[in-house]
């Protein structure tokens, strides 16, 4: 059984989502957003670090999946997004958790079936796949999608690392 923390980093709003999988069933645990205040960038990065640290301490994930930075038209925005990712990754590294990174198109492909899917399509599919009563907030849905992407890619990554111990009904397990 693995508990996966998905993170959708942002300099103002960072989404997080937790799922638990036991090779047969994927269960929703929690999701939400860390809203960094209106302070300076350093203060917001500290809030992201502390927020992710608190989530890790509360839910004890086994692995972390983080969405990679995509190129913005504005280089300043891309740099701030990269710094927000760094704060979230540092929180996971500080907790000695394995970190896996996925591009936005990989995440969308895993959840919707199209790498160019709209955010509303991601929200809709997350609601269906995890049997949620309502669509989660955009950033939380992206984080849950990142966790689901890792859940789908996990057996492949484990096989590449030589960690696969067996196969049961078409799915690998550790």
UniProtKB/Swiss-Prot annotation:
Keyword Amino-acid biosynthesis listed: no
Cofactor note: Binds 2 Mg(2+) ion per subunit.
EC number: 3.1.21.10
Catalytic reaction annotation: Endonucleolytic cleavage at a junction such as a reciprocal single-stranded crossover between two homologous DNA duplexes (Holliday junction)
Assigned GO CC terms: cytoplasm; Holliday junction resolvase complex
InterPro entries: RNaseH-like_sf, RNaseH_sf, X-over_junc_endoDNase_Mg_BS, X-over_junc_endoDNase_RuvC
Record: residues binding Mg(2+) 1: 8, 139
Cofactor: Mg(2+)
Cleaved signal peptide residues: none
Keyword vocabulary terms for this entry: Cytoplasm, DNA damage, DNA recombination, DNA repair, DNA-binding, Endonuclease, Hydrolase, Magnesium, Metal-binding, Nuclease
An individual GO BP term: DNA repair
Enzyme class name: hydrolase
Gene3D superfamilies reported for this sequence: Ribonuclease H-like superfamily/Ribonuclease H (3.30.420.10)
Organism superkingdom: Bacteria
Similarity-based family: Belongs to the RuvC family.
Task performed by this protein: The RuvA-RuvB-RuvC complex processes Holliday junction (HJ) DNA during genetic recombination and DNA repair. Endonuclease that resolves HJ intermediates. Cleaves cruciform DNA by making single-stranded nicks across the HJ at symmetrical positions within the homologous arms, yielding a 5'-phosphate and a 3'-hydroxyl group; requires a central core of homology in the junction. The consensus cleavage sequence is 5'-(A/T)TT(C/G)-3'. Cleavage occurs on the 3'-side of the TT dinucleotide at the point of strand exchange.
HAMAP family: RuvC
UniProt subunit comment: Homodimer which binds Holliday junction (HJ) DNA. The HJ becomes 2-fold symmetrical on binding to RuvC with unstacked arms; it has a different conformation from HJ DNA in complex with RuvA. In the full resolvosome a probable DNA-RuvA(4)-RuvB(12)-RuvC(2) complex forms which resolves the HJ.
Protein name, per record: Crossover junction endodeoxyribonuclease RuvC
């Amino acid at each position: 059984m693995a508990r996966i923390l998905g993170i959708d980093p942002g300099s103002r709003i960072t989404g997080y989502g937790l799922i638990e999988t036991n090779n047969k069933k994927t269960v929703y645990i929690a999701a939400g957003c860390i809203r960094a205040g209106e302070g300076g960038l350093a203060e917001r990065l500290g809030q992201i670090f502390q927020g992710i640290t608190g989530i890790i301490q509360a839910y004890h994930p086994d692995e972390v999946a983080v969405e990679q930075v995509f190129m913005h038209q504005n280089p300043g925005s891309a740099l701030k997004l990269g710094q927000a990712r760094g704060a979230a990754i540092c929180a996971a590294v500080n907790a000695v958790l394995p970190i896996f990174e996925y591009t936005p198109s990989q995440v969308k492909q895993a959840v919707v079936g199209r790498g160019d899917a709209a955010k509303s399509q991601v929200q809709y599919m997350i609601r269906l796949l995890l049997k949620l009563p309502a669509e989660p907030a955009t950033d939380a849905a992206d984080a849950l999608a990142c966790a689901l992407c890792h859940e789908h890619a996990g057996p492949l990554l484990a096989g590449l690392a030589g960690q696969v111990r067996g196969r049961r009904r078409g799915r690998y397990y550790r």
